[in-house]
Amino acid sequence: MSTSDASIIKPIQWCAIEPPNLPAAIADWLMELGSMTRRFELHCQQVHVEPQRECFISRDELGEEAEHLPISERYWLREIVLCGDNQPWLLGRTVIPEGTLSGPDRALVDLGTLPLGRYLFGGNNLTRDYIQVGRQDELWARRSLLRLSGKPLLLTEVFLPASPLYSI
C-alpha cells in the first residue's frame, strides 16, 4: 500500500446530467443504488480488495472534490482496486471528512482489505444524495455523495475494462 501523492484515479470528465446516449444496461450499473460489491459478487466466485493508498490528506489535496464536501482540516483518503476472481474490475476512491469519522464510524480508517460496501450497506443508516456519471477515456465512472448517519463521504468508482459492466 502506498501513501504517495499520486492518485490511482486519473482525471474524469463528469457529466452535468445523465448522457442521453448512455446504453440502458450500462446505466443500470452506473445508477446502482445498492452495494457494488454485492452486485459484483453475482458475476464471480470471489471479490477482494487491494488497498493502494490510505492516509489523511488536507483540503488542498482534494482538488474539485472539495466542492462536494464540507470544510474539514483533514480528510481520510482510501484508494483501492476491487477485483473479481483476481481480475481488476474497479478503482475506488473514498474521501471522508474527519468529522464523519466519529463514534463507531471511526472504523472506516481500519477497513484494510474489507470492501467499503460491506461496511456501508451492513446497517440501515446510509443515504445517497446523488450519483454523477463520468468518463475517463473509454472507461465509465461514477461518484456518489453518501451520508452515513447523516455525515458525508464522497465515493468515486472507475469501472475497469474487465468489469462485468462492459460484458453486456
From Swiss-Prot:
Keyword Disulfide bond: no
UniProt catalytic activity: chorismate = 4-hydroxybenzoate + pyruvate
Key word Kinase present: no
GO cellular component, one term: cytosol
Keyword list, A-Z: Cytoplasm, Lyase, Pyruvate, Ubiquinone biosynthesis
A GO molecular-function descriptor: chorismate lyase activity
Location (main, coarse): cytoplasm
Subcellular location, record wording: Cytoplasm
Biological process, per Gene Ontology: pyruvate biosynthetic process; ubiquinone biosynthetic process
Positions bound to substrate: M36, R78, L116, E157
EC number(s) recorded for this UniProt protein: 4.1.3.40
Pathway the protein acts in: Cofactor biosynthesis; ubiquinone biosynthesis
Pfam families in alphabetical order: Chor_lyase
Broad class of enzyme this protein falls into: lyase
PANTHER family registered for this protein in UniProt: CHORISMATE PYRUVATE-LYASE
Role, per record: Removes the pyruvyl group from chorismate, with concomitant aromatization of the ring, to provide 4-hydroxybenzoate (4HB) for the ubiquinone pathway.
Family: Belongs to the UbiC family.
Complex and partners: Monomer.
Name the UniProt record assigns to this protein: Chorismate pyruvate-lyase
Species of the source: Yersinia enterocolitica serotype O:8 / biotype 1B (strain NCTC 13174 / 8081)
